[in-house]
C-alpha cells in the first residue's frame, strides 16, 4: 500500500506537444493568459445560424399611419418652394398667400472719420497734443468766469507724504511759528 500512496495525481493529464518554443512559454507568465490565441471555430454556431435565417412574423402587419407633427406642419407651411401664390393649408384646401409689404428703410448718413495714421492716434491720446477742431463749430459765447473768492485763512495743501507722516505715531506737525520763520528766510 505504501506504493499506492505516493504523490500521484488522481487523474493523469496527458501532455500535449505544443508548437511553441519553451522560451515563449516562460515569457507569458504564470497563468499563460498573454499567449497567442488560436482561432477556434465553434461547431455550435453554424446550425444555430441556419435556424434563424427566416424571420417569422407573429403579428399581422399593421398599416402605416401617417402622423403629422406640429413641426412638420410648420415646416411645410413655411416652405416657399412653390412658385404659385396659393398653398395648401392643414385642411387640404388651397389658400392664397398674403403678400408681404416691405417698409421703406430710412438711410442714415454716417460721417466717416478721417483715416488716421498710427502717430496721429498716439498724439490724440497724449494730453496737450490734440488736433484743433473746426473753428466754426467751436465758436461759442465767451464764458464768464466769476472772480475767485478769497477765504479768511488759506488752506494748506498737503502732499501724500505729509498725510502719511501725520498718521504715524509720535509725529508732531510743525507749529505755525516755525512755519513763519521758514517763510521769512
From Swiss-Prot:
Cellular component aspect of the GO annotation: chloroplast; cytosol; extrinsic component of membrane; mitochondrion; plasma membrane
Keyword Transmembrane helix: no
InterPro entries: Dehydrin (IPR000167), Dehydrin_CS (IPR030513)
Domain of life: Eukaryota
PANTHER family on file: DEHYDRIN ERD14, DEHYDRIN XERO 2-RELATED
Tissues of expression: In stems, cauline leaves, roots and flowers. Low levels found in maturing seeds. Absent in dry seeds.
Bias (Basic and acidic residues): 1-13, 25-45, 52-78, 103-134
Residues that bear N-acetylalanine: 2
Record PTM Phosphoserine, positions in chain: 59
Sequence repeats: 112-132, 154-174
A single BP term in Gene Ontology: response to desiccation
Keywords: Acetylation, Chaperone, Phosphoprotein, Repeat, Stress response
Positions of region (2 X 21 AA repeats, Lys-rich): 112-174
Species in which this protein is naturally found: Arabidopsis thaliana (Mouse-ear cress)
Record family assignment: Belongs to the plant dehydrin family.
Pfam families per record: Dehydrin (PF00257)
Biological role stated in the UniProt entry: Intrinsically disordered protein acting as a chaperone. Prevents heat-induced aggregation and/or inactivation of various substrates. Binds to acidic phospholipid vesicles without affecting membrane fluidity.
Segments for region (Disordered): 1-138, 166-185
UniProt GO MF annotations: calcium ion binding; lipid binding; mRNA binding; phosphatidylcholine binding; phosphatidylserine binding; protein folding chaperone
Protein name: Dehydrin ERD14
